[in-house]
Curated annotation (Swiss-Prot):
UniProt keyword list: Cell membrane, Guanine-nucleotide releasing factor, Membrane, Phosphoprotein
PANTHER family, alphabetized: ROP GUANINE NUCLEOTIDE EXCHANGE FACTOR 1, ROP GUANINE NUCLEOTIDE EXCHANGE FACTOR 14
GO cellular component terms, A-Z: plasma membrane
Official protein name in the record: Rop guanine nucleotide exchange factor 14
Organism: Arabidopsis thaliana (Mouse-ear cress)
PRONE domain segment(s): 127-500
Signal peptide limits: none
Comment block on domains: The PRONE (plant-specific Rop nucleotide exchanger) domain is responsible for the GEF activity.
Any one biological process term the GO annotation gives: regulation of pollen tube growth
Amino acid sequence: MMLMRRRLACCSREREISIDFDEHEQDKMITYYGLETCIINNQSYEEESGTSRGDGCLTDSLDDDAFSSCSSSKDASSSFSSKWLPMKNDEHSCDGLNLSGRSQHFDAKEKKKQGYGSSQHFDAKEKPGYVYCHLDVEAMKEKFSKLLLGEDVTGGCKGVQVALALSNAVTHLATSIFGELWKLEPLCEEKKQKWRREMDWLLSPTNYMIELVPSKQNDANGRSLEIMTPKARADIHMNLPALQKLDSMLIETLDSMVNTEFWYSEIGSRAEGKNKSTSESKRWWLPSPQVPKPGLSNSGRKKLLDKGKVVYQVFKATKAINENILLEMPVPIVIKEAIPKSGKNSLGDELYKMLAVESATVDEIFISLNLGTEHAALETVNKLESAMFAWKERITEQGSNGKSPVRASWSFAKDPLSEIGRNESLLNRAEALRTQIKSKHPNLPHSFLDATKIQYDKDIGHAVLEAYSRTLANLAFRILSRMGEILKEDSLSNPNSPAPPSCFPSSRDPYRTPERPLLSSRVRHSLTDDMNKADGTETGLDFLFADAKASNSVNTTPSRSSRLWCLSKVPSDTSP
């Protein structure tokens, strides 16, 4: 027995495991200290040309299709260090907790040059920028317990995927902190601390996301071996620090709204709302922006415009990141089976004939559609994306087989090459039309395919990036909306003041947001219409309350709830 214990002594020792990843490449860390400088320097406040500079920064044009990062990086997948040490049983103090999420590292020389800097680095010993107490730890336990339960408090099998639960948690947190943001004013310190703290919790899983890449290494005998080396996941490493920087820029914009020339008046009685005009009575219960009688001063107006253009750049950046993440998400299998196999069935006869006429340009098709409301624009986008998916599937199938799937030997059979070319032509025109619609309606909510991608997504990294970028885009849009209201009041007070730029959205509908610009009549009808009936006024927005036409096709935009939509197949025909 003693001999056996001696032989197994090597296995019974306590070992400390330390795994280092590319420790010799500490300098290859991506930094984002140049992002804010590029965005601010890119503004051309005196010129309305809307062109972009050669450095790749974003422009003020609503029709920009490309988004390039304004960061300076040496390596897209820079190295990082991650150490797993066995945790001792007596280490339970709050001082030893690492709950900060993504740590920030500053280089002394770069900080002296640029003033600030940040890089993504995985270090288990970094301490948070704020102090945790026992209540914070208990709140974190409660939040992660609900995430693991999949929003099913019974602990049964009705919970949602972890990715969807995490996405919903980010959305709910942003709603509780920012809400509809009816005023341009700084956030209270308690809300800012809660936003930073709980976002660190929700982003903490990304600290441990890696991908294995092949690399060569020499052993002790000099032989070259090919091994799989862990690297930071590229999409997380590139996008998350940029989103965090954009987040801080939006918070700083709100913090700067002190000692302003505008203010808000609280109208608290319905009698006062009756005396208002029709346009004002629609939102008399909300804070109303006020400006001095002569209007804003030139310096105050310029300051507001400058901040608005920076926020607009942040809005475009977050929207671009969100769209790129959605493109990487796969279409769920249940949706693939429900989408009509024919693009003509998805588009309908009228829209299909418009795309089939090659002599008509995309601009002419867009004008002929006459999309007066965002509801009509979203419905058209849903049809186009469904048809585009069907055409892509058919092109892929024909290309892999090398022949038409229903090819016949008769002379009058369709030529597979000509059919592929026709499908590609229709696909390109449909994609161009969709881009045109989104450029004219930049605040459209997610289409049906995008919403189902989020609902069925299992990739936690994609879920975090999509939800984070979406909430920041919503916040940037609300800030722009409030700025647009102030500039509108300024133009009413001073007719000589310049008109607000096109980047500021209209404030016609107080319920309009990029995620939910148009609400169903079942949600909005009772409150708004009952108030208007009591006031004896008309809103002039009856067309916004119309219910969508009932349809069994995939053209209906689904709800954000976890309820599954019952989709019926539409029989396909031989037309593309």
